[in-house]
């Protein structure tokens, strides 16, 4: 099959993305702050015949795949295909009905707690705490992951700067624009430098970061 490239007129959305740094030659503050990860042969995430049943309903049926270190891997499918259920099993939030899975070499059946500390998870529906302010959500995430006091302060300050949250710190997440809600959720997921990051529909409503 042959591939042809053709120039098309610019759209309003293209100019908007370009102004935000998401166009050709644009820079990403987030990418600049994250350490580069080289592709390797080590397996970061693997599952074999992973299945989840809710009574007579099978949400995921014998899912198998491997994700190597440094690889970006996506799950595609219509609503109800089991993508979020698969994520939740890999994050240790749901117990599989059958099959096995490993994250960074840890068996989910035996080391669920340890696995949770080695990954970041940005849920499809916001996993933010509405009764807490933006700052308190960041502080809570840092505390949950057991960061020491000095590291906690440094990481919170870095996340505020990286995701441009400085003007929203005293506001409740529910009062934020959708894009800033997404920024806050991603900041919380990245707080502890996780080697594995699960993103469930992360680009909905978000602008380039």
Regions found by a protein language model. Give the residues of each.
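ABC-family P-loop ATPase nucleotide-binding domain
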Residues: 3-52
């Amino acid at each position: 099959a042959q591939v042809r490239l053709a120039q098309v007129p610019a759209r309003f959305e293209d100019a908007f993305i370009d102004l935000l740094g998401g166009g050709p030659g644009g820079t990403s503050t987030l990418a600049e702050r994250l350490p580069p990860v080289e592709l390797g042969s080590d397996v970061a995430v693997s599952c074999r015949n992973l299945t989840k049943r809710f009574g007579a309903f099978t949400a995921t049926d014998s899912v198998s795949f491997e994700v190597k270190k440094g690889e970006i891997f996506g799950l595609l499918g219509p609503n109800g295909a089991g993508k979020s259920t698969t994520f939740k099993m890999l994050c240790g939030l749901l117990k599989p009905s059958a099959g096995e899975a490993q994250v960074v070499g840890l068996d989910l059946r035996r080391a669920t707690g340890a696995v949770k500390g080695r990954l970041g998870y940005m849920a499809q529906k916001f996993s933010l705490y509405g009764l807490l302010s933006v700052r308190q959500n960041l502080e809570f995430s840092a505390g949950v992951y057991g960061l020491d006091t000095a590291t906690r302060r440094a990481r919170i300050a870095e996340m505020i700067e990286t995701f441009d949250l400085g003007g929203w710190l005293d506001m409740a997440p529910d009062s934020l624009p959708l894009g800033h809600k997404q920024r806050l959720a991603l900041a919380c997921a990245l707080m502890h430098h996780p080697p594995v990051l699960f993103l469930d529909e992360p680009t909905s409503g978000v602008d380039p970061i």
